[in-house]
Structures are given as C-alpha cells and as structure tokens.
Amino acid sequence: MSWDDEAINGSMGNDDAVLMDSWDAEIGDDEPVMQSWDAEEEEKKPAPKPKKEQPKKVKKGKESSADRALLDIDTLDEKTRKELIKKAEMESDLNNAADLFAGLGVAEEHPRARALQKEQEEQALKRPAFTKDTPIETHPLFNAETKREYQDLRKALTAAITPMNKKSPLNYSSSLAIDLIRDVAKPMSIESIRQTVATLNVLIKDKEREERQARLARVRGGTATGGAGKKKVKGKTNLGGAFKKDQDFDLDGPDDFEFGDDDFM
C-alpha cells in the first residue's frame, strides 16, 4: 500500500494528517501551475523611450556671452579680428605656461605679470609728449639745490634756448634775451647785478675783438693791429753812415777851396 492510499483510506495517523494539511497549504500558497507547457509566454511590454531633452528656450534679448562675443567679433574688420585672436591665443599660452610652472613647483613670476611689467618699462622709456600747457617747472632739473645741480640746469637751459637765435635773431634779442636777463636779475642783490653787468662788459669786449678780427680778415692786406687798408711804409736804404744829412755839400755856400792861378804853377 502506498503512502497516498493510506491518506485516502484514512489509515494515516493524526500526525500524518497534520503533515499533509501543512503540505497542502504550502502548495496552495504557490503560484498556479501552467496548464500547458506549450503556452506562449506573455510578450514583454516595450520599455518606455527616454524623453529627448528639449533645448532651453532663450528669451529674446538675452543671448549668451559666447554668442554675444562671437557676434561682436564678426562685426569687426579682418585686421582687428586677427589681432584679437592673436591676443587671445597669447593669453591662453601664458595661462598654460603659468599652470605648468605651478605644477612643476617653479617659483617664478607669472608670465602675464612679466609681460605687463616689460610693457610698462617700454612706455616709461618713451619720450613724454609735452604740450604748451605742460608746466616747465615740473621737470626734475628745476628741483636744483646744490651748486652742481644749478650748473646742470644752466647748461640745459643754454642748450635749449641759444639755438633759437638762428630762427629769428631780432626776436631772440629784443623779445627774449634782454627781457629775460632783466627778469632773472630782479630778485638779485645790487652787488650780484653789478657782477652780472661786469660779466656782460667782458662779453662786449670779447665780441668787439672777434668782430674786428673777422672784418680785417676779409680786407686784403689788412693787419690785426692796424686800420683796414692801411698801406705799409717802405723802409729807407741803409748806406752804412757814409753820407749823413749834416755832411751834405752846400753848393750855394762860400767856396772854401778856392785855388789861385799861382797854385797850378
């Protein structure tokens, strides 16, 4: 007799009945058994397609900075555009070099700062553009305090002013030099003014001598000490004292050497 027949005929004990009940309960809780193995499997539902991200709409009048820069550079001429591109490439190279130096631990100055410093030095070496409104007293030479500094100022002023005489001697003397000497001498003491006058008198004598020598050099036969065109006096012939003026014969005077007829006898 099999184990199933005992369960049907009731010959199974209580313990065995309880075991059967629990086994049936476990079977009942399982999923239902398919009636046919040939049943087709349910078609799997297709996975939902991912939604495409829609580009964000940009409000009118609010363009991105890159688009705005692109539009600005497109409006420039070819030369300016090339200069801007070259400048941008240079800045990019400098930044890359700075990052490389920083990664290598090289403690050096930033290339951009070095380039800026070099540009500033070149600008400082360039000659400043002075205008008529530029105050001349702002020049460092006018901060003179020592004797040497005053001499340097005098030499600089002399070198800058005296060439103007070639442009217009009349205006140089009447409108500049004479009035300038007077104005400069005003704050001076009387003794200092006298020294200035004495210096000018010496200058006058030197100029007179130079003009006289130049005039005599232009005249043929002139001398530096004599007058212009003065003829030279020829010297007398030296006879060695044989004849003197007081020993000349007087033909009109009495005849001291009269000879009588008897002298030739």
UniProtKB/Swiss-Prot annotation:
Lineage: Eukaryota, Fungi, Dikarya, Ascomycota, Saccharomycotina
Xref: HAMAP family: eIF3j (MF_03009)
Keywords: Cytoplasm, Initiation factor, Methylation, Phosphoprotein, Protein biosynthesis
Other known facts: Present with 17900 molecules/cell in log phase SD medium.
Omega-N-methylarginine modifications at: R220
Organism: Saccharomyces cerevisiae (strain ATCC 204508 / S288c) (Baker's yeast)
Modified residues annotated as Phosphothreonine in this record: T75
Annotated stretches, region: Disordered: 1-71, 219-265
Residue spans of biased composition, Acidic residues class: 23-32, 249-265
PANTHER family: EUKARYOTIC TRANSLATION INITIATION FACTOR 3 SUBUNIT J
Localisation: Cytoplasm
Gene, per the UniProt record: HCR1
Protein name: Eukaryotic translation initiation factor 3 subunit J
Modification sites for Phosphoserine: S65, S92
GO molecular function: translation initiation factor activity
Top-level division of the source organism's lineage: Eukaryota
Family stated for the protein in its record: Belongs to the eIF-3 subunit J family.
Main location: cytoplasm
